[in-house]
C-alpha cells in the first residue's frame, strides 16, 4: 500500500468503527504485548446505515443484510495467522452479536480472495456475488440462530 493510501484505508476500515462502534472492536495482544490483529465490527445493518453508503455493494446485497445484519472487518499480522487468533476474534464478535439478539453476521470479500477459506472455516457461507469497482465480491453470511438437531430415538418398544 502506498503511503498516500494508508489514511483513507484506516478511515474506511477502522475510523468509522472506532468512532461509532468501539464496543465491537476487538484486539488480539500477544504474550509480549504486540498487537497480533483486530476485528472491527458493527451490530447495525449497513444497507440501512448512511455511514456505509460508500460501500456500493450493499445496494446489491441489501436483502441479505436483513438476516445477516452484523458485519466485520478483520486483519491479522501475517506472523500470527494460522494460530486460531482470527477465529477467536470472530467467535468473540459472534457471541456479542448473538447476545444482542442479532440473527447473523456477514463479511464481503473478493470472490477469489485467500480469506474466503478462512471465513468458510468459521461457518460463513457464500450467499451472493456482485460486481463492484471492477472486481467480483462475495457476500458471506453466518447464522447466529441455534441449529436444529434431529433427535432419533434408538429405544425399542
Each language-model region and where it sits:
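Active-site rim helix/loop that mediates acceptor-substrate recognition in acyltransferases
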Residues: 2-31, 40
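Conserved acyl-donor/pantetheine-binding loop and adjacent beta-alpha core of acyl/acetyltransferases
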Residues: 40-74
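Conserved GNAT acetyl-CoA-binding A-motif
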Residues: 68-70, 74, 96-111
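Conserved acetyl-CoA-binding loop-helix of GNAT-fold acetyltransferases
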Residues: 73-76, 82-98, 120-121
Amino acid at each position: 500500500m502506498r503511503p498516500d493510501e494508508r489514511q483513507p484505508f484506516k478511515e474506511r476500515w477502522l475510523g468509522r468503527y472506532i468512532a461509532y462502534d468501539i464496543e465491537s472492536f476487538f484486539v488480539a495482544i500477544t504474550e509480549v504485548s504486540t498487537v497480533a490483529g483486530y476485528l472491527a465490527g458493527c451490530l447495525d445493518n449497513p444497507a440501512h446505515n448512511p455511514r456505509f453508503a460508500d460501500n456500493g455493494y450493499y445496494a446489491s446485497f441489501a436483502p441479505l443484510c436483513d438476516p445477516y445484519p452484523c458485519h466485520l472487518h478483520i486483519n491479522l499480522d501475517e506472523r500470527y495467522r494460522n494460530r486460531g487468533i482470527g477465529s477467536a476474534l470472530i467467535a468473540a464478535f459472534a457471541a456479542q452479536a448473538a447476545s444482542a439478539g442479532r440473527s447473523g453476521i456477514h463479511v464481503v470479500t473478493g470472490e477469489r480472495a485467500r480469506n474466503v477459506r478462512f471465513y468458510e472455516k468459521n461457518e460463513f457461507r457464500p450467499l451472493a456475488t456482485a460486481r463492484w469497482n471492477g472486481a467480483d465480491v462475495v457476500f458471506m453470511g453466518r447464522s447466529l440462530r441455534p441449529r436444529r438437531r434431529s433427535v432419533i430415538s434408538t429405544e425399542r418398544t
